[in-house]
Amino acid sequence: MANIRKSHPLLKIINHSLIDLPAPSNISTWWNFGSLLGICLGLQILTGLFLAMHYTSDTLTAFSSVTHICRDVNYGWIIRYLHANGASMFFICLFLHVGRGIYYGSYNYLETWNIGIILLFALMATAFMGYVLPWGQMSFWGATVITNLLSAIPYVGTSLVEWIWGGFSVDKATLTRFFAFHFILPFIITALVIVHLLFLHETGSNNPTGLDSNADKIPFHPYYTIKDILGFIIMFLFLMILVLFMPDMLGDPDNYTPANPLSTPPHIKPEWYFLFAYAILRSIPNKLGGVLALILSILILILMPLLHTSAQRSLMFRPIGQCLFWILVGDLFILTWIGGQPVEHPFIIIGQLASIMYFTIILILMPLAGILENKIMKL
């Protein structure tokens, strides 16, 4: 009789995805982040479910319901901070995962890459709506400013914004629908993750060299399960340090003030993981231009496979490409820093230069580096 994990219709799928999956023998720690993202998603759904049991999506009681969770609910404070800082860990893993994909040329798996970009947009939407729910000052004004960007769309913009708000300003209707969407989106994301994995398993994983690894495969379990567990322990350690020692480090102090439509905070900014895109948005003096740049800063990832000019898939043996990649990483750090600064000299010009640099590296310099490296290879 065959092993049940190989014969049972349901267990067979899990077996082929997580146990007997043939994996390249040389994938490094950079390949850990996919599983870590899965763990993060599970943690967010679980903690979010328990928070939703006590949260009320009403403008009059939302802020006090979050306070109630932290003060009166058994271990409510740890559930709340696990959820808030879990989102930060989620985005750290996400950026590293996407960075790995760019560095090692994983974007050449078109379906997997494009589903990944859809996932990225879905996660950003979910995180943004989640930030509105505690109904603090930054929640309210962040929601007002970001949703207001849609009014830049010609002709239909204003109607669209009022339709999203459910009125003439961010109010009770907005909060209620944001809570509904914030609750449902993670389950849609889970479905997309399954599709993401389905497409990945059609081709198999890429590896650091970017070469075909069919000649040298090893089973996923036990080799990579144990490696993923190590990654999970390290991530959980960092998360618990954040949650237990500095839970508010990545948050905004303004969010401890209940939302007040009559008082604008001196500096409105989103969560730290959106600051790079926010800096690109602010670097363009025109509203519509800024919104387009904001969308393109993420949508540019779709062009990655088209902009690949090198004969080699990975950046592992491409020194010029490597230099440009790490300059791009540095540029993203600068943009993140600028996004959190007030709009004044010298931050404006730094933000504009960093934004130009971001698009120039991806659209012009990286493809040119690929062509140049091809020519050097033929010498």
Curated annotation (Swiss-Prot):
GO CC terms in record: mitochondrial inner membrane; respiratory chain complex III
| UniProt protein name | Cytochrome b
SUPFAM superfamilies documented for this protein: a domain/subunit of cytochrome bc1 complex (Ubiquinol-cytochrome c reductase), Transmembrane di-heme cytochromes
The record's InterPro entries line, in alphabetical order, gives:
Cyt_b/b6_C (IPR005798), Cyt_b/b6_C_sf (IPR036150), Cyt_b/b6_N (IPR005797), Cytb/b6-like_sf (IPR027387), Cytochrome_b (IPR030689), Cytochrome_b_C_euk/bac (IPR048260), Cytochrome_b_N_euk/bac (IPR048259), Di-haem_cyt_TM (IPR016174)
One GO molecular-function annotation for this sequence? metal ion binding
Please name the gene that encodes this protein: MT-CYB
Q: Which cofactor does it need?
A: heme b
What's an example Gene Ontology biological process for this entry?
mitochondrial electron transport, ubiquinol to cytochrome c
In which family does this protein belong, per the annotation?
Belongs to the cytochrome b family.
**Purpose:** Component of the ubiquinol-cytochrome c reductase complex (complex III or cytochrome b-c1 complex) that is part of the mitochondrial respiratory chain. The b-c1 complex mediates electron transfer from ubiquinol to cytochrome c. Contributes to the generation of a proton gradient across the mitochondrial membrane that is then used for ATP synthesis.
The residues that the entry says bind heme b b566 are 97, 196
Name its cellular compartments: Mitochondrion inner membrane
**Native source organism of the sequence:** Myospalax aspalax (False zokor)
One Pfam family this sequence matches: Cytochrom_B_C
Electron transport as a keyword of this entry, yes or no, is: yes
The annotated subunit structure for this chain is:
The cytochrome bc1 complex contains 11 subunits: 3 respiratory subunits (MT-CYB, CYC1 and UQCRFS1), 2 core proteins (UQCRC1 and UQCRC2) and 6 low-molecular weight proteins (UQCRH/QCR6, UQCRB/QCR7, UQCRQ/QCR8, UQCR10/QCR9, UQCR11/QCR10 and a cleavage product of UQCRFS1). This cytochrome bc1 complex then forms a dimer.
Give the taxonomic lineage as stored in the record.
Eukaryota, Metazoa, Chordata, Craniata, Vertebrata
Spell out the note in the miscellaneous section: Heme 1 (or BL or b562) is low-potential and absorbs at about 562 nm, and heme 2 (or BH or b566) is high-potential and absorbs at about 566 nm.
The residues that hold a ubiquinone are 201
